Amino acid sequence: MSKVIIIGGGAAGMFAALGAVDAGHQVTILEQNEKLGKKIYITGKGRCNLTNACETSEIFENIPRNAKFLYSAIYGYDNFRVIDFFEEHGMPTKTERGNRVFPVSDHSSDVIATLQRTLKNKGVTVRLHTKAEHLEIEEGKVRGVKTSNGTTYPADAVIIATGGYSYQTTGSTGDGYRFAKKSGHTIAPLSPSLVPMTVKEDYCMPVSYTHLRAHETLSDL
């Protein structure tokens, strides 16, 4: 049984852990925060809009750039499989305006609880307050992960699931890019995806992260 270390215990890290353990591996999640899924708690205004019930092909129509890059990932585990996963593990869902899918309870904590319970039932080891510091690489292969407290976790494979740079207060500080670069990967230039817009002026910075329902009108010029 090979050992798989997953750096990061967010949504991607937890689902990666479930996939790895189902494939017969011994899995450990290293999470620097005090709990798993910290960013999940704040998604969908605390309700967790966990996926969309539209046809899978429609998802790509709403990705602003390089949608083809996501083809294999999304078709490999599409939005309907996500819904089925939570339903099968005891968390009913509902679909609202715009085909947005939420837990019936309207609590993002139920999404996390479902994932945590499934991880525990499948025997995944979780190490909280454990910050990955760097990868142990020998002869071009990753052999383990060294943490900030000096502990080294040996591994046959390492999955980087640290998130990007957004909402750094949740722990997304870009460590994954550093790990990937050290292991030989090339890092492409980063740019926003949710709102792919660059603004020259700085007067709009105070309204960053402000949500509102907007309307626009075009007149005959």
Predicted regions and their residues:
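N-terminal Rossmann-like FAD-binding beta1-loop-alpha1 element of flavoenzymes
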Residues: V4-T28
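Residue-level detector of alpha-helix initiation sites
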Residues: I6, G10-A11, K35, G164-S166
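Short beta-strand to alpha-helix junction loop
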Residues: Y71-Y77, N99-Q116, Y167-G171
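Single conserved hydrophobic/aromatic residue that forms the stacking wall/gate
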Residues: H211-L221
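Short hydrophobic core segments
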Residues: Y153-Y165
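Glycine-rich FAD pyrophosphate-binding loop
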Residues: D22-I40
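A conserved short coil-to-beta-strand element within the FAD-binding core of flavoproteins
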Residues: L128-K141
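Glycine-rich active-site loop/strand segments that organize a redox cofactor
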Residues: R47-T93
